[in-house]
Amino acid sequence: LTFLKFTAPVLSQEDLGQLLAHAWILEECPNQDRNVSKRELLALFRSVPPELLMDEEEHTVYRSLDDPVTVYRGVTSYNAKNIKALSWTLDRETAEWFAHRFGEEGTVYEAQIPKKYILAFFNGRNESEVVVDPKHLEQIMESPEPEMGMRMT
């Protein structure tokens, strides 16, 4: 992501879109990159039309999202202070996995966000990840455990 911060002005939108999506998906903690601020990340994502960030399947999901969108985020002690991050998921089970990885007893949060503030949808790692402008997250709260027998979709 640091590379893109400096090269974005000379890249075509197509190249920037492909490289940004690839770098975002491959970086372990893109929300906590010390070299690229949230403001800079948001500017990078906003500088590229969404269809250039996603493959056709991802863009189809992106276009079909409800408005507003319910999103989830799993946090551990490592990132507990970074709830209002760019990276959320559409899938509560994925958020649950992130909240409990590394043997942690983390927390799953849920929020609502107007669709226009979702900058991309990525499913390259089967995480149903949405990149959001976090200042537009609404009704952030701890997500209640699903009742037994309920199936999360």
Residue map of PLM features:
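Conserved NAD+-utilizing ADP-ribose enzyme module
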Residues: L1-V71, T76-L86, L90-T153
